[in-house]
């Protein structure tokens, strides 16, 4: 009896300690997760309803590709009177139609989401049916993490302490002994790793085969062209370069464009574009009947003629003199209603002149300058676009080593003509390298600088630290539990959502000045930059939540890394549940609203005064993988890391990818354009980051198992996994990567035999420098 009373006292003393614990933001209660789910669901439903209503009202804004369609795509339609009719149509669109409607890049992007849905569905099944029940049987916890801070889990601990007789307080802090159920962790770490690798490899084979079949049918000028860099000075001439390439017996050259330092011509065209835009605006402000002086041009110029001519004309026709004077007077009055402008500094100072006449003179002047500039000689750069006579010859040339010297005659497949950034192509080698390295260094320094606010944010959101800096706020949170839950449970996810909203656009801006020669190269580079930022800042820095001294300590003693990572991961489990719920259920549906276009549309519509601006008003927004892809990859990595430990994160991640798949599917097919010509080359970036996620998963599980008494035996069982994982990465780099970059000759020859190669609708494109050959168009008037 005394023993039983002692157990009750011990359990009561344990319960007394629960309410007094400071609620760390890394350990939000399950009630906070429920609140987050309610908020996110409400936001998601609101966004879905709003989009469905706005789609009916403004179909040209939210389904702009249907109206831009020239008849070749034949995008599916739905009943406009139905509020949710678009959902059924979207669901029925097959993979082959995605490839037809949105292109190869969109197909690869959505294939990644489909793979994640299949993978997490398998993980969720085993987690719900096997892992969680076994773990609950042995520990009384559904998930392995600090998710037991609410009253329900406290009751579970109370019962276990009474039944097991663990009244000694020392046992609460002692290392947990190794249990039989921990071998389940080892088993499922192996199982989940091999399932993930198997599905990633299977999806790689699928993407590669689809890419080979899709691109093997193409016979466009883009598919026949290579970009040649490192051209020696003596060969920077079209005829000499053509002769040298054909001497190598790799095919016949159809055409060559030597890139030159056309910088002055670029500046003239940029200036002309501004003048043309201002001229069209002034025409739009002018009454239609006064836009041209043609009816009064003769009389208008008479004002500047010699009086003798006018007198002579008047002597012969005296009856018309009064009519001419009336016409001149009318012309002066009418022309006074035309728009005026000052030609001084920024249009504020200087003489006031007729705006249309002045801008037309400026346009004629700069056109003359451009015509003259086109005749000038410009120094050749070491880059050229070489169009071969066949796709097969272009593929062989792109994969061949043409010169024994280093950095000479380097071949790559050429981007599409519309994908080229000619301002960067025209740069000299010195200027381009300066841009590349200076921008890279600046981005690296910016990334390091951003570690500081993130780490401080992670520290300051701790209730103890808040009390130290703001005692009144800390006391308020201690007195009001609901406020503490909001600040330490919900606030971090929203702050990080805001913090990670603007930084990717900042990196996009910096990348545009990096000197890359095509938009597709910028896009792929942006994927790497943004993923590095959110992975380092949102995951590593925020999870470890320490200062620079902590990181150096981890590096000095590498044995601490796995254990510290496992400990931090456990503490952050419900934080990541909150984050994934908010991003997936709450924020994803808002992407359908195209908030930027929605907010800016009324303003842009008001400012759209010229026919050119009105034509561009309903142009679809540009879909940039560099902005959209990094976060889903990070969410997949987080779910992989927690796959054995947290059923909540697995189910949240599954919901994230299901919602994301249909949101992006709609955007890529109906609402946005993807202009860069990257031909599915984003898949290698995805595969490598899946491998990184698996390695972190294995490292975390090693640290988790090592934390138990005698856990070194279990941890040592996982040592082969990283080696096996890296072997699959090596196999991918050696065998699959070339097929992700190039087209196999057998794929090309197969479709050549079938006579089914596709001559693209863009055959009018060429690699001629556009500013050297394009027409000098006049203002567009309505």
Swiss-Prot record:
Q: Which GO terms describe its molecular function?
A: calcium-activated cation channel activity
What is the activity-regulation note? Activated by hyperosmotic shock after mannitol treatment.
Q: What is its main location?
A: membrane
Q: What UniProt keywords are attached to this protein's entry?
A: Calcium, Glycoprotein, Ion channel, Ion transport, Membrane, Transmembrane, Transmembrane helix, Transport
What's any one GO cellular component for it? plasma membrane
Q: Which GO terms describe its biological process?
A: monoatomic cation transport
Membrane topology for this entry? Multi-pass membrane protein
Q: Where in the cell is it found?
A: Membrane
Which chain regions cross the lipid bilayer? 35-55, 117-139, 182-202, 441-461, 486-506, 531-551, 579-599, 622-642, 649-669, 682-702, 710-730
Q: Report if keyword Ion transport is assigned.
A: yes
Where would I find glycosylation on this chain? Answer: 171
Q: Cite the ranges annotated as topological domain Cytoplasmic.
A: 56-116, 203-440, 507-530, 600-621, 670-681, 731-782
Q: Which family does it belong to?
A: Belongs to the CSC1 (TC 1.A.17) family.
Cited function: Acts as an osmosensitive calcium-permeable cation channel.
Question: PANTHER family, alphabetically?
Answer: PROBABLE MEMBRANE PROTEIN DUF221-RELATED, RE44586P
Q: Can you say what this protein is called?
A: Calcium permeable stress-gated cation channel 1
Q: Mind giving the lineage of the organism this protein is from?
A: Eukaryota, Fungi, Dikarya, Ascomycota, Saccharomycotina
């Amino acid at each position: 009896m005394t023993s039983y009373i002692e157990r009750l006292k011990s359990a009561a003393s344990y319960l007394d300690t629960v309410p007094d614990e400071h609620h760390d933001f890394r350990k939000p209660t399950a009630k906070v997760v429920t609140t987050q789910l309610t908020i996110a669901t409400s936001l998601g439903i609101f966004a879905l309803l709003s989009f469905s209503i706005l789609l009916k009202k403004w179909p040209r804004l939210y389904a702009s590709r249907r109206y831009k369609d020239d008849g070749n795509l034949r995008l599916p339609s739905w009943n406009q009177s139905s509020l949710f009719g678009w959902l059924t149509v979207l669901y029925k669109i097959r993979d082959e139609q995605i490839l037809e409607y949105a292109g190869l890049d969109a197909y690869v992007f959505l294939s990644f989401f489909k793979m994640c849905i299949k993978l997490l569905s398998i993980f969720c099944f085993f987690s719900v049916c096997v892992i969680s029940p076994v773990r609950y049987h042995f520990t009384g916890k559904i998930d392995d993490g600090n998710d037991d801070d609410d009253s329900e889990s406290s009751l579970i601990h109370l019962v276990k302490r009474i039944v097991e007789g663990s009244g000694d307080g020392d046992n609460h802090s002692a290392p947990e002994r190794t249990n039989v159920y921990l071998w389940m962790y080892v088993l499922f770490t192996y199982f989940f790793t091999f399932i993930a690798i198997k599905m990633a490899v299977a999806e790689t084979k699928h993407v590669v085969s689809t890419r080979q079949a899709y691109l093997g049918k193409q016979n466009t000028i883009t598919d026949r062209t290579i970009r040649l860099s490192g051209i020696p000075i003596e060969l920077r001439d079209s005829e000499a370069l053509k002769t040298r390439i054909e001497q190598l017996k790799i095919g016949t050259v159809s055409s060559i464009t030597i890139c030159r330092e056309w910088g002055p011509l670029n500046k003239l065209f940029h200036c002309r574009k501004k003048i043309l835009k201002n001229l069209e605006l002034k025409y739009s402000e002018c009454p239609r009947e006064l836009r041209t002086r043609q009816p009064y041009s003769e009389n208008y110029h008479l004002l500047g003629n010699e009086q003798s001519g006018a007198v002579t004309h008047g002597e012969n026709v005296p009856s018309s003199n009064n009519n001419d004077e009336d016409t001149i007077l009318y012309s002066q009055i009418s022309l006074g209603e035309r728009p005026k402008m000052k030609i001084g500094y920024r249009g504020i100072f200087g003489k006031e002149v007729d705006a249309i006449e002045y801008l037309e003179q400026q346009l004629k002047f700069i056109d003359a300058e451009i015509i003259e500039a086109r005749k000038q000689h410009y120094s050749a750069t070491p880059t050229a676009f070489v169009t071969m006579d066949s796709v097969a010859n272009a593929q062989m040339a792109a994969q061949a080593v043409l010169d024994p010297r280093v950095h000479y005659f380097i071949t790559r497949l050429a981007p599409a003509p519309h994908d080229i950034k000619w301002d960067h192509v025209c740069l000299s080698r010195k200027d381009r390298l300066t841009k590349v390295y200076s921008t890279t260094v600046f981005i690296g320094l910016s990334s390091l600088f951003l570690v500081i606010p993130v780490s401080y944010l992670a520290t300051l959101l701790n209730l103890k630290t808040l009390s130290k800096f703001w005692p009144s706020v800390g006391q308020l949170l201690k007195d009001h539990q609901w406020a503490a839950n909001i600040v330490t449970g919900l606030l971090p996810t929203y702050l990080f959502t805001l913090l990670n909203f603007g930084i990717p656009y900042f990196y996009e801006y910096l990348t545009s000045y990096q000197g890359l020669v095509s938009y597709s190269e910028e896009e792929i580079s942006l994927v790497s930059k943004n993923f590095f930022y959110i992975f380092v800042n949102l995951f590593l820095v925020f999870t470890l939540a320490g200062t620079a001294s902590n990181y150096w300590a981890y590096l000095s003693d590498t044995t601490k890394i796995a254990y510290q990572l496992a400990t931090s991961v456990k503490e952050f489990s419900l934080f990541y549940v909150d984050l994934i719920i908010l991003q997936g259920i709450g924020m994803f549906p808002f992407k359908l609203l195209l908030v930027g276009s929605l907010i800016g549309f009324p303003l842009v519509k008001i400012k759209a005064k010229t026919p050119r601006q009105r034509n561009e008003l309903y142009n679809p927004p540009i879909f940039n993988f560099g902005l959209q892809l990094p976060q889903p990859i990070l969410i997949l990595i987080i779910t992989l890391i927690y796959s054995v430990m947290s059923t909540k994160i697995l189910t949240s991640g599954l919901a994230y990818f299901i919602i994301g798949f249909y949101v992006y599917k709609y955007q890529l097919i109906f609402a946005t354009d993807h202009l860069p010509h990257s031909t599915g080359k984003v898949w290698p970036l995805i595969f490598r980051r899946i491998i990184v996620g698996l390695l972190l998963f294995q490292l975390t599980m090693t640290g988790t198992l090592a934390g138990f008494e005698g856990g070194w035996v279990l941890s040592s069982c996982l040592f082969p996994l990283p080696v096996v994982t890296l072997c699959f990465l090596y196999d991918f780099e050696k065998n699959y990567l070339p097929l992700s970059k190039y087209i196999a000759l057998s794929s090309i020859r197969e479709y050549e035999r079938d006579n089914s190669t596709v001559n693209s609708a863009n055959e009018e494109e060429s690699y001629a420098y556009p500013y050297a050959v394009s027409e000098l168009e006049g203002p567009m008037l309505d």
